């Protein structure tokens, strides 16, 4: 259901039809003209073409979060969207490797949802200030201070924090979870 709702956000990079860097450059240029200078698009098209080739060779799927760098966003992902949508895609993929171009907790969530797959996050430093707002240790201390109080964590937290929580919610279902 979630995938059907967000079908308008699914983006094909047309990578199956892009056989060379020049074609990819033109495809990217159409989307990025006036946003990124041509010389930068040309350089990034070369990198993107290499990534697309590796993706095919390794049977990988690339998931791109909405906050990705524009040139890569418009060239390499098989799907783009928010973290919840992309996690849903990750849970259903047949690909051997999931490359999650997003922040660290998104890759962790993909691994939780599809534990037999290899999940890669291109940058270990890709953090989220929201997820950094509370650590597992912080939560353990709060649970000691307030024993018996159910803990509800937001989906945008790290896996170790979620593991210490009683419930995990999204912005869309927080009200229902809290009234439970």
Language model: regions and residue ranges:
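Active-site loop-to-helix "anion-binding N-cap" substructures in soluble metabolic enzymes
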Residues: 12-180
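Short, Lys/Arg-enriched N-terminal segments with co-localized hydrophobic residues
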Residues: 1-10
């Amino acid at each position: 259901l979630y995938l059907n709702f967000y079908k308008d956000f699914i983006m094909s990079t047309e990578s199956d039809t892009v056989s060379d860097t020049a074609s990819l450059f033109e495809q990217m240029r159409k989307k990025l003209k006036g946003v990124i200078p041509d010389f930068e698009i040309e350089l990034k098209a070369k990198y993107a073409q290499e990534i697309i080739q590796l993706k095919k060779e390794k049977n990988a799927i690339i998931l791109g979060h909405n906050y990705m760098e524009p040139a890569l966003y418009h060239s390499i992902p098989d799907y783009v969207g928010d973290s919840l949508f992309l996690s849903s895609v990750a849970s259903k993929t047949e690909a051997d490797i999931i490359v999650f171009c997003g922040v660290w907790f998104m890759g962790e969530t993909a691994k939780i949802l599809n534990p037999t797959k290899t999940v890669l996050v291109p940058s270990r430093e890709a953090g989220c200030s929201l997820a950094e707002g509370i650590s597992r240790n912080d939560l353990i201390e709060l649970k000691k201070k307030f024993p018996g109080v159910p803990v509800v964590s937001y989906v945008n937290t790290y896996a170790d924090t979620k593991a210490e929580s009683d419930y995990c919610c999204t912005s869309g279902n927080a009200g229902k979870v809290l009234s439970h």
